[in-house]
Design a protein with these regions (language model features):
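Exposed, interaction-prone extracellular/peripheral surfaces
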Residues: 157, 161-343
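An amphipathic, basic-hydrophobic helix/alpha-beta surface used to engage anionic
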Residues: 1-239
Length: 343
């Protein structure tokens, strides 16, 4: 007996197929064969006739296997919630022809399935992404390295006179300027807050924050920007807080999405202000920090400013659109731009 999925992963809300494969290699038929397994209730069967749902989904399917027969049954499922899901074993029950004797066997399975964070539409992600790119471009302009030559282009009125290449201008008959690479690396560190669980509003805000992190990171990696992701959320596989290290190239986007799929939001996580203070000693001044956090009660802003040491940063703030104004964050910062995201 083998249980598998026809895809390794789907995005939240998408569909896949769970495939049950039964092989009877014996020279005797099996008139009744019951195959049972359990998995997370957040992977939903379209046909719930043979399923019992409580804290888990318990599935029981009945087969009749002829002599040396292979049976394949496909069951459509939908990923209802982001997560990393496993099926560890199946229980197989068979009976004799008279239905008087029962045999039970257990088959280990190594079935893994990822439901990745939900996609966010381009129209919604465009504003925060353009703000990130704008900060990266402005930082490059401020910190051009005169020793890192990157080519020649036409003169613009905003260019300093010291950048004019007089020899090239004389040959071309028009003013040309030298281009320089930046002393700052094009690197963004995404700080993701996963604190809280239990209420529909809290869960929705956390899931939105995780989806924003995934979407922004994928776009930045595709544009050649290095990305690191750090979160107080706990990896359900190794039990540690997420810290990806530096990722480069569009091919690492799927790896990051898988890591985010495994994040567990809890009430007992390290508070974001404390995590920011912990990160301060190892901070890289050249990185652009992007905080994604719904936190509006604890004093996050001073610790974020201390982490960036006065450099520009962005705080994407998912918030409940029904939240009363008196509970909303009113603090402002010269160096941290707060981008509100209604959910």
């Amino acid at each position: 007996v083998q249980i598998s999925f026809d895809r390794d992963y789907i995005f939240c809300g998408e569909e896949a197929n769970l495939v049950e494969t039964i092989v009877n290699n014996k020279y005797l038929p099996l008139p009744v064969l019951e195959v049972g397994f359990d998995m997370s209730r957040w992977v939903v069967f379209q046909d719930e006739e043979n399923s019992t749902v409580s804290d888990m989904t318990y599935r029981r399917d009945v087969f009749t296997a002829s002599v040396r027969q292979r049976i394949t049954r496909t069951l459509p499922v939908r990923g209802k919630k982001r997560g990393y899901y496993r099926i560890a074993s199946t229980t197989v029950t068979s009976y004799d022809f008279l239905m008087t004797e029962k045999q039970v066997a257990h088959f280990p399975q190594e079935t893994e399935f990822y439901v990745l964070p939900a996609h966010i539409s381009a129209s919604h992600i465009r504003i925060p992404y353009s703000k990130i790119m704008g900060l990266l471009v402005s930082r490059r302009r401020v910190y051009d390295d005169p020793f890192e030559f990157a080519g020649i282009r036409d003169y613009r009125r905003s260019d300093p006179m010291k950048y004019i290449n007089w020899k090239a201008s004389a040959r071309g008959g028009t003013l040309l300027v030298n281009q320089h690479d930046s002393t700052l690396s094009q690197k963004v560190t995404v700080l993701l807050d996963c604190t809280g669980i239990g209420s529909a509003v809290t869960d929705a805000l956390n899931e939105t924050a995780i989806s924003i992190a995934a979407e922004l990171a994928e776009r930045m990696l595709a544009d050649g920007i290095s990305v690191s992701a750090i979160s107080n959320g706990i990896d359900t596989v190794d039990g540690k807080m997420l810290s990806t290290g530096e990722l480069t190239g569009r091919n690492t986007a799927l790896y990051l999405r898988r890591q985010l799929a495994r994040l567990e939001c809890r009430n007992d996580l390290t508070p974001m202000p404390q995590l920011l203070r912990t990160l301060h000693d190892g901070a890289h001044g050249s990185d652009l920090y992007v905080l994604i956090s719904k936190e509006q009660k604890l004093p996050v802003l001073p610790d974020l400013e201390a982490l960036t040491e006065g450099s520009d940063a962005i705080w994407i703030l998912p918030e409940d659109r029904n939240m009363p104004e008196r509970y909303k964050l009113t603090e402002t910062s010269k160096s941290v731009e707060i981008v509100r995201w209604e959910v």
